[in-house]
Design a protein with these regions (language model features):
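Short beta-strand element of the alpha/beta-hydrolase
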Residues: 37-47
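Short amphipathic alpha-helix adjacent to the substrate-entry channel of hydrolases
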Residues: 54-74, 93, 142-145, 214
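Conserved alpha/beta-hydrolase
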Residues: 66-87, 145-152
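Alpha/beta-hydrolase active-site loop
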Residues: 93-183
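Hydrolase active-site cap/lid region
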Residues: 208-276
Length: 409
């Protein structure tokens, strides 16, 4: 019989920024209690995974039922990054002071009064802006394809914000530790982490911060270096719609670059300054760090897909990372996708993610990984790992029932 369960636990605070976490960590599991369980499999959703919770539950059930595993979804810190079909997990689109400042600047270009501009009047102001721009284009006073750029902010639920990577990765290990405490018979099973885009990045990052709790990684298009547009994108020079912020919404004569709420900034006098060490710890393409990881566990199987033409996360960084892992003795399979590998079924395009849904990714790669891991005992043994990053040392370690980050000068 297929069993579905949900748990809420305490996890980690934001150690980097000194912010106390107020939300609980939720994770959901699915398993068939009539079958012999082969592994613990974490299905890691990327940006937008919260949009359809029913769909999320259904393909977790599919994986648990078809592959005899405990399938786990962790609703990690800042999991709620988009509008959701379940209000509890929905983000709110809003306009911050920075957004309103830019909108006002654009409106004044067209002599539109701004004395009534506020969060609840932005839409009506933009409708008026669209009317004026339509008229100017009809009069050939604006190029027909000209667009203005506006900005908006996504406010995640549960009082969360975009920390990017570290807290979300720690959440998965805390969920694992809670899971095996509740179900001790699962403790020695192989542990597999996988997902696409940000989910793939988190799977790779988990292998970095807690390699002794990882047996396999299934990655599709995870970034080997942190994409800064998702962290401090608001402060970066604008280059294109696709690389500015988290996403954009298209209007008739303007588009809206959307940014997830974050505390990170490049303002050096801020307590939330995103410094070099914060970048280094999130970077997977770091030879010295990969050597330290390999000293803790070389028995991780890596399977990765990446488009050679990926416009968001350059393939050459992933290629270099996987080459180093292979030299260090890891079992690595990197599938670099070019136009000859597009089959219209599994691989649909050369865009970011290659058009591969998570369900299809696991359906193809999970049986092969389970076969390789058959009979492996993966013991839950406490450990720690230290990564020098500039003037800081990031220490990830087990502390009783918890997994924690400590930063030392």
């Amino acid at each position: 019989m297929l069993i579905n369960q949900s748990f809420e636990i305490d996890s980690c605070d934001d150690v980097e920024l000194g912010i106390k976490r107020t939300s609980k960590l939720e994770y959901r599991i699915s398993y068939d209690d009539e079958k012999e369980i082969k592994a613990i499999v974490f299905i890691i959703g990327g940006y937008g995974a919260n949009a359809n919770i029913y769909f999320l539950d259904s393909y977790r059930n599919y994986i648990a039922k078809n592959f005899d595993v405990v399938a786990v979804h962790v609703f990690y810190h800042c999991f709620c990054q988009r509008r959701s079909d379940v209000e509890k997990y929905s983000t709110l689109a809003d306009f911050t002071k920075d957004d309103l400042k830019l909108i006002e600047k654009v409106l004044r270009k067209y002599n539109i009064p701004c004395d009534q501009l506020a969060n609840n009047t932005v839409v009506s102001h933009c409708e008026y802006l669209s009317e004026i721009m339509t008229e100017l284009k009809m009069l050939n006073r604006l190029p027909y394809d000209f667009e203005e750029r506006l900005t908006a902010t996504f406010i995640p639920s549960r009082g969360e914000y975009q920390n990017f990577g570290i807290m979300a990765a720690i959440d998965h290990i805390n969920a694992l530790k809670d899971l095996v405490k509740r179900f001790p018979k699962l403790a020695d099973l192989p542990k597999i982490y996988g997902g696409g885009s940000y989910g793939g990045y988190l799977a790779l990052l988990i292998a970095k911060i807690a390699p002794w709790y990882v047996d396999g990684v299934i990655d599709n298009s995870g970034s080997a270096v942190p994409p800064l547009n998702y962290i401090i994108g608001r402060e970066l020079e604008f280059k294109s719609k696709d690389t500015n912020g988290d996403m954009y919404m298209q209007g008739d004569h303007f588009f809206v670059s959307c940014f997830l709420k974050t505390h990170w900034t490049r303002k050096e006098n801020s307590p939330y300054f995103f410094n070099n060490e914060n970048y280094f710890i999130r970077t997977l393409l770091n030879k010295d760090h990969l050597i330290l990881q390999s000293q803790k566990n070389k028995n991780i199987i890596y399977v990765s897909y990446h488009s050679k033409e990926d416009p968001l996360t350059p393939a050459n960084f992933k290629q270099q990372t996987m080459q180093i892992l292979k030299i260090l003795g890891y079992d690595v399979s990197l599938n670099l996708i070019d136009e000859n590998k597009i089959d219209g079924k599994f691989i649909k395009n050369l865009d970011h993610g290659c058009g591969i849904p998570d369900k299809a990714l696991f359906r193809k790669e999970l049986p092969l990984m389970l076969e390789k891991l058959q009979g492996r005992k993966s013991l839950m043994q406490e450990n720690s790992i230290s990564y020098p990053c500039g003037n800081k040392v990031f220490i990830f370690k087990d502390v009783g029932d918890k997994f924690e980050l400590v930063i030392k000068d």
